[in-house]
Amino acid sequence: MRHDVLVYHYHLATRPCERFSRFINSSDYSFATVDTTNDLKALKVSDMKCPNLVNIQHHYKVWGSDKSKLNSLVDLASAIIDPYYAKMKEESNKDKNAWHSVWHERLDEQHVKYVAMDAYTSYEMYRRIVDMRNYLLPDPDEGSSHIAVAG
């Protein structure tokens, strides 16, 4: 199975993109990610909104983690998808200031790969969370509360 990920770096856009704006404002899609803080700031600077932006941290908590802290992308992906994702943290263990300082510039290959991996991982986690909820929620037409009692 193949998945395509579009990386649109709107910080470098020289003019507003009407198609992109319509896409992120569409009620047909939800956009899921981990920690929406910077996304919301960047969208605001670009004078854009994304009404269906989902912060996965508010929909899933890793069992046994500190209840007062939000889980990271790696923690969530390791718990929801596969423990293999714990290696992502080791691979991206770089100088945080240097790593984060270039997001407003043209992205190098490492950052583009990270963005694509982040996007796919967020998609897969949210898909699994939605699936889990769909299987756990009772069917409104079934169950003992819907059985007619003969009197």
What is each stretch, according to the model?
Residues 1-128:
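Conserved DEDDh/DEDDy metal-dependent 3′-5′ exonuclease domain
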Residues 117-151:
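Acidic two-metal-ion nuclease catalytic site recognized across multiple nuclease folds
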